[in-house]
A protein has these predicted regions:
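Enzyme catalytic cores with a strong preference for nitrogen-chemistry domains
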Residues: 1-298, 302-308
């Protein structure tokens, strides 16, 4: 099976634009021979959608756009995994899940909901989402796959000295027979993040002896910056496919021979910080719809960065 890692730059709340973006990437993936294209966490709503999730009309429109995306992508003959939200249907607890949806043949055929909801640092997901209590592997092509959402795959007891959560979704899915891990993410950037991710997921790949497909969001959404830097690994924890940093990208990997396309020209830490800040400023202006800006230069380091 050929899997396309679709590293997209979603705009929070722009359901129509985000759906069109994913359809365009799905078309590119199909033309490149992919059987499956994987998008980041909450790629339909944009991340983080925050209080938009409290609007019933937004939830209605999200489901409508998801169904339309499934129908529009049907002629491409490529399966899609994308991030969305799902109503729980329960009168108790939070009303929605953070979900990964599988689209095939014009229909939504499977949903996996996020189990581990971060509430530290920049995250406040437990304010909006209900945690999933169960999960199951699914058959994608000729592979039994584990589908996880960001934090779900960041809790390997073999790596962390002290874990934030008692459950390990990856361990549970591997025990249930999953032979490949697909992880969709909206993982913000900080200095050293690429090396940290690689180390964590290499340990997970070796621990469970499974290849990993890790797809991350790219772009700036208000104060959060996402570097992308998506990758695929073999069971030895070696990177076999990799996407660019700080820009949209589409790369393919093959589960049969565990090969893929690589982007190895990554910036050093200093250049990465500059690219992250430039991307964040550029996206803030573009996504807010500003036609022009006034730059005030006072002579400090902030002014120097703005001028650069």
């Amino acid at each position: 099976m050929k899997i396309a890692l679709a590293q997209t730059n979603s705009t929070v709340g722009d359901l129509c634009g985000n759906a069109k973006l994913m359809l365009a990437f799905a078309r590119r993936a199909a033309e490149a021979g992919a059987n499956l294209v994987v998008f980041p966490e909450l790629s339909l709503t944009g991340y983080p959608p925050r209080d938009l999730l409290e609007k019933e009309s937004f939830l209605d429109r999200t489901e409508q756009h998801l169904e339309r995306l499934a129908a529009d992508a049907a002629p491409l003959n490529v399966s899609i995994i994308c991030g969305t939200v799902t109503r729980t249907g329960s009168p108790a607890g939070h009303p929605i899940y953070n979900s990964a949806a599988v689209l095939q043949g014009g229909r939504i055929v499977f949903r996996q909901h996020k189990m581990l909801l971060p509430t530290y640092d920049v995250f406040d997901e437990a304010r909006y989402f209900e945690p999933a209590t169960k999960q199951s592997p699914l058959a994608l092509g000729n592979a039994v796959s584990a589908l996880t959402i960001c934090e779900d795959a960041w809790n390997d007891k073999q790596y962390w000295e002290r874990r934030r959560y008692s459950r390990d979704p990856v361990e549970e899915l591997a025990s249930a027979g999953a032979r490949i891990l697909i992880s969709i993410n909206a993982s913000p950037y900080h200095m050293g993040k690429r090396a940290q991710r690689t180390e964590i997921f290499a340990a997970t790949a070796r621990h469970f002896r499974v290849p990993i497909v890790y797809v991350n969001q790219v772009g700036g959404n208000d104060q959060l910056l996402f570097d992308g830097t998506s990758f695929a690994m073999n069971p030895e924890g070696e990177v076999i496919a990799s996407a660019a940093s700080f820009e949209e990208d589409l790369v393919l990997m093959d589960t049969k021979d565990l090969t893929g396309e690589r982007h190895d020209n990554y910036p050093d830490e200093c250049d990465a910080v500059y690219q992250a800040l430039a991307m964040g400023t550029r996206d803030y202006i573009r996504k807010c719809g500003f036609a022009r800006v006034i730059i005030g230069l006072s002579g400090g380091i902030d002014s120097a960065l703005t001028a650069a």
